């Protein structure tokens, strides 16, 4: 049957963003990213991925005579790729451009095998032709209908989609919903990596290259279990094999069936490996199943959401679905923003599904973010925007395209005055006092400093540059002087006999009483349950030091947990890992493993295996979790004073307090500085180390709040203050625990130091050790070399591969880690380092360095790692409930999409199928081959070695046999790590998208700290063409 021509006309009118052709039983859907006409790229690596969508009947938990995984319906959907160079792109046109000429690939829908009662499958696309906050329209297409092609362009058109034959990339992953079961079947070729998310309680990770399948129970502190812990899998992946994984739930039991086979020989292969896991009774039911896949060669990430149950009203579910299809990673924030933009009353039914905090702050949220700014802030923002618009030669074009800086001789009188006025405003709003100490430069000095910084950040967008122009160093006459007094580290001696300082001798002195006390402490600790939770800041503020010590009689009452430190000697024999898996996981007589009991067993075994979506073995950045205690720790500014050792030590101490449940209270750096026994004149000019930090606090038995004794580097020379009764003591009864000196580290009371030179032939062990410490204590202290390597203009956005030096001169902190792909196509890993040179230095005070650095370095960039060994005492930590009520919209960790792509990425230097033994080595630090970037000395290294990867994210929502699609294009995959990105801006008019995105970028710094940045941007925009809730 042929579709009427007028039917095509109606489609074109209603769906201006999509070009839909039906011919016989063929349906083609092409969607633009968020409604903008941005010349979506389709190159020779285009891939057509195939999906098996099964009937989703209502009899979901009942047994069926039908074979699990049998399919009723096959659909094939088109996928697009993003080439390495967007300049050489092939244009995909929307329906509004169909007259200009385009050809398309087809989507094939077959109806073979459908029962008489099976409803027609509807394919629809997330429409961008709606007003902000409106719901998506859906498009139904008869399976056997077609339209005349008379209105369609021919293949000879000058703007065809495929200008040449497009080779098909082998399909890696297919997935489909099971009929009559709550579950999915996933099939593909061995070597791929995918995830299955049973929303909202269980995540399944499948690294098929190594036949590794892991379960993560989100209801039980993210306890992760490997399916081989029950016993080795009989079905192993190898080159040329395919796999099938069936996941389904029956009667509160999660069933996994795993099978590998040669192509076309599935029926001849061995029996499947079967695993069963008992799921406890949970407040919220499973609502959907999501399958995450990636094709690194095609530059595509795909997310499929199979709806199995809706537990919220249709109106609210439609808003949440709209947020999902536009790529939002924090559905709840997008959901709240939409309600605000739509001006829904608090009595609306959807407000039952937002946080209580949002309800309380309803009126406050509707106030513009910038209303809290002082007049000088307004003027400074305007001045920065003016400078950025004039400093580039092509100021009339969009900012991101113009990177050619004007020459010094091009400075006119007006622009020179603008630069001088900018520095005066910066001096007024700066609280560090830097510009009070240094001489301000003239217009030429400011221009030279500014252009030097901009050249180091040539690839950054306007959001980043607006922040960089708040770095006070730009206004200093002799800018290289800015860093001179910021370095202040001297290495401690290794033993009392070699000690040249009183602090070293003091902390190396101990007696039998010390050892006995430490031994007793450790013995007691081994009998208690470890609980290293990040405690939310709102609860933390109710804690004070009076509740550090509770009645010993309450320890085993079952209602509380007590937090202790643990023995770091475990590293010497790796017992922290051996103890975890020394015996197989026990199952009941029916072969079922209880997930809740397993999670409790893990927590009792070791504190190191406290998993978190913001900090696990592959990725860690707790500052991304804005509800955590650690995220409340601010970036410090040490000023023109060499007290880096104090700031690195106090951050480490504060993260330990957070990890032990004490909450975050900012401690006074000035108190430590002024209670030093050194001469006042030497405190800023001569360096020291964390040993002195511990000595001072152990002697004084006191550490006040920052608000009690505020820091100013100009005051770092006063006498040690007298202690008013009103001051809070953060040190309390803290004890320094002794750790004996062994072959590869220095042990002092409360202090352990590892030098990387001792691990030169075993960096895997060093990396593993540091990761565990960061997981357990929140951070570690590091010694690094900064002279001739790091300056005021250092770009912290990328990853740097740098050598170290024999003698470090600066102390900082490792606060996280992760993986990346370098410009050579190698898989690498990085450390996330926090400095104390202000929020506007680096990347919001941080920077990233490659873990191993270049080849043939004499010294690693991390010279030494230090961590404290303290007994903070016992504290009362209420047990967490297994699930929070009214949490309807979960969010993944920021690294979720990146790690999905990373694990599917095949290094360009090695495409071979790796053996199972290779998995152990790759798992330690994620590196493929050694990098040889930069020079041996690591001098003047500013260029990032990280590869810029463009990504297309395809999102599919399958509900009631209907498929809705959304597309989001990212110019850099690192954008997927950000909670907010302007790439997700939605435009009502395709031609307005660039305008909407530019407005988002320009105004982002004004709205980023608002409770709802999307609502703030909408309020500032005033127009009706843009929807910012998806950012």
Curated annotation (Swiss-Prot):
It is found in: Parasitophorous vacuole lumen; Parasitophorous vacuole membrane. The keyword Transcription regulation does not apply. Residues 104-139 have a biased composition (Polar residues). Just prior to merozoite egress from host erythrocytes, proteolytically cleaved by SUB1 to generate the active 75kDa form. It holds the Pfam family Peptidase_C1. Residues 1-24 form the signal peptide. Residues 91-163, 490-567 are annotated as: Disordered. Its main location: other. The gene is SERA6. This is Serine-repeat antigen protein 6. One of its GO terms (cellular component) is symbiont-containing vacuole. The record marks 95-96, 370-371, 927-928 as: Cleavage. Keywords: Glycoprotein, Hydrolase, Membrane, Protease, Signal, Thiol protease, Zymogen.
């Amino acid at each position: 049957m042929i579709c009427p021509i007028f039917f095509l006309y109606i489609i074109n009118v209603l769906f201006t963003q999509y070009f839909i052709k039906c011919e016989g039983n063929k349906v083609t859907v092409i969607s633009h990213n968020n409604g903008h006409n941005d010349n979506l790229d389709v190159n020779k690596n285009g891939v057509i991925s195939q999906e098996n969508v099964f009937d989703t009947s209502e009899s979901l938990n009942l047994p069926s005579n039908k074979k699990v995984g049998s399919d009723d319906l096959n659909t094939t959907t088109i996928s697009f790729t993003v080439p390495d160079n967007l300049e050489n792109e092939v244009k995909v046109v929307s329906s509004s451009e169909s007259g200009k000429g385009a050809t398309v690939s087809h989507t094939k829908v077959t109806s073979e095998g459908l029962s008489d009662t099976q409803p027609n499958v509807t394919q629809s696309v997330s429409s961008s032709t709606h007003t902000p906050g409106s719901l998506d329209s859906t498009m139904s297409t008869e399976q056997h209908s077609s339209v005349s092609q008379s209105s369609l362009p021919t293949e000879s058109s000058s703007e065809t989609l495929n200008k040449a034959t497009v080779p098909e990339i082998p399909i890696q992953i297919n997935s489909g919903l099971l009929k009559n079961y709550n579950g999915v079947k996933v099939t593909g070729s061995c070597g791929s990596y995918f995830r299955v998310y049973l929303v909202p309680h269980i995540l399944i990770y499948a690294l098929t290259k190594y036949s590794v399948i892991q379960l993560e129970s989100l209801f039980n502190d993210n306890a992760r279990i490997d399916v081989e812990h029950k016993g080795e899998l009989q079905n192993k992946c190898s080159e040329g094999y395919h796999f099938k994984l069936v996941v389904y739930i029956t009667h509160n039991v999660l069933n996994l069936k795993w099978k590998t086979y040669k192509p076309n020989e599935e029926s001849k292969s061995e029996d499947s490996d079967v695993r069963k896991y008992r799921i406890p009774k949970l407040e919220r039911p499973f609502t959907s199943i999501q399958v995450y896949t990636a094709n690194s060669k095609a530059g595509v990430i795909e997310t499929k959401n199979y709806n199995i149950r809706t537990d919220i009203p249709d109106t609210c579910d439609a808003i949440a679905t709209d947020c999902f299809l536009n790529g939002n990673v924090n559905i709840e924030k997008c959901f709240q923003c939409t309600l605000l933009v739509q001006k829904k009353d608090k009595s609306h039914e959807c407000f039952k599904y937002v946080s209580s905090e949002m309800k309380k702050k309803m009126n406050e949220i509707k106030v513009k973010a910038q209303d809290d700014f002082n007049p000088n802030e307004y003027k400074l923002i305007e001045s920065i925007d003016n400078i950025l618009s004039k400093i580039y030669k092509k100021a009339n074009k969009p900012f991101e395209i113009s990177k050619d800086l004007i020459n010094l001789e091009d400075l006119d009188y007006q622009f020179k005055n603008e630069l001088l006025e900018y520095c005066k405003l910066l001096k007024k709003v700066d609280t560090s006092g830097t510009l009070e100490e240094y001489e301000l430069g003239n217009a030429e000095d400011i221009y030279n400093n500014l252009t030097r910084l901009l050249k180091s950040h040539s690839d950054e967008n306007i959001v980043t540059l607006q922040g960089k122009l708040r770095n006070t160093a730009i206004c200093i006459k002799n800018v290289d002087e800015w860093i001179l007094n910021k370095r202040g580290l001297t290495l401690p001696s290794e033993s009392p006999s070699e000690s040249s300082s009183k602090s070293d001798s003091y902390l190396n002195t101990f007696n039998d009483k010390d050892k006995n006390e430490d031994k007793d402490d450790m013995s007691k600790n081994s009998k208690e349950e470890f609980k290293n939770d990040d405690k939310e800041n709102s609860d933390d503020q109710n804690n004070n030091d009076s509740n550090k010590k509770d009645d010993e009689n309450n320890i085993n009452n079952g209602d509380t947990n007590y937090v202790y430190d643990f023995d770091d000697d475990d590293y010497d024999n790796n017992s922290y890992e051996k103890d975890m898996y020394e015996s197989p996981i026990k199952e009941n007589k029916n072969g079922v493993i209880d997930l809740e009991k397993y999670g409790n067993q893990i927590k009792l075994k070791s504190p190191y295996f406290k998993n978190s979506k913001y900090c696990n073995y592959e990725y860690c950045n707790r500052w991304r979790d804005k509800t955590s205690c650690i995220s409340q720790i601010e970036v410090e500014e040490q000023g023109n004073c060499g007290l880096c050792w104090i700031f690195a030590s106090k951050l480490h101490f504060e993260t330990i307090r957070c990890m032990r449940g004490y909450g975050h209270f900012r401690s006074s750096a000035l108190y430590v500085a002024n209670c030093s026994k050194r001469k006042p004149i030497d405190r800023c000019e001569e360096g020291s180390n964390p040993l002195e930090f511990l000595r001072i606090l152990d002697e004084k038995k006191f550490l006040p709040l920052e608000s009690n004794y505020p820091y100013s580097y100009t005051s770092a020379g006063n006498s040690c203050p007298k202690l008013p009764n009103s001051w809070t003591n953060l040190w309390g009864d803290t004890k320094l625990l002794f750790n004996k000196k062994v072959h590869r580290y220095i042990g002092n009371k409360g202090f352990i130091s590892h030098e990387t030179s001792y691990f030169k032939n075993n960096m895997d062990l060093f990396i593993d050790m540091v990761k565990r410490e960061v997981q357990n204590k929140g951070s570690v202290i590091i010694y690094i070399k900064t002279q001739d390597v790091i300056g005021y203009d250092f770009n912290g956005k990328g990853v740097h591969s740098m050598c170290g030096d024999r003698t470090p001169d600066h102390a900082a902190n490792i606060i996280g880690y992760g993986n990346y792909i370098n410009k050579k196509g190698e898989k690498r890993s990085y450390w996330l380092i926090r400095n104390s040179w202000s929020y506007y230095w680096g990347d919001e005070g941080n920077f990233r360095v490659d873990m191993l650095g270049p080849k043939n370095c004499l010294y690693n960039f991390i010279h030494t790692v230090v961590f404290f060994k303290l007994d903070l005492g016992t504290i009362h930590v209420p047990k967490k409930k297994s699930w929070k009520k009214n949490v309807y919209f979960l969010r993944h960790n920021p690294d979720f999409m990146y790690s999905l792509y990373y694990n599917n990425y095949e290094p360009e230097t090695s495409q071979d199928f790796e053996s199972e033994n290779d998995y152990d080595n790759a798992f330690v630090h994620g590196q493929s081959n050694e990098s040889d970037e930069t020079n041996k000395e690591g001098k003047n290294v500013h260029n990032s070695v990280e590869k810029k990867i463009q990504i297309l994210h395809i999102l599919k929502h399958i509900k009631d046999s209907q498929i809705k699609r959304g597309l989001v294009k990212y110019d850099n995959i690192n954008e997927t790590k950000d909670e907010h990105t302007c790439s997700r801006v939605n435009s009502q008019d395709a031609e307005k998208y660039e305008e909407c995105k530019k407005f988002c970028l320009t105004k982002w710094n004004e709205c980023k700290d608002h409770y709802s940045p999307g609502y703030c941007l909408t309020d500032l925009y005033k127009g009706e063409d843009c929807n910012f809730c998806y950012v």
